[in-house]
């Protein structure tokens, strides 16, 4: 497995997100209840960065059309989104946050 360091834990507070690059792939990194999760960075419905969306109750709302995704599973929760997000494995070692390379899947 190819793990890529993308951030330090202190960079994100709970219910915050940021876009990171993992070997040229845009990935949205989320912190929920002191756990880290990663999905593809773009909404599956339209060209919008999910890291700019509203994060609440383990879901992210697309900033463009308000479609919602479950951050933990990538599941599309409501219209207009119908296609699930791809999720990425995340691990934390001390303060360092790693995401598995999308190419490693």
Question: Where are the predicted features?
Answer:
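Rieske [2Fe-2S] iron-sulfur-binding domain
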Residues: 11-105
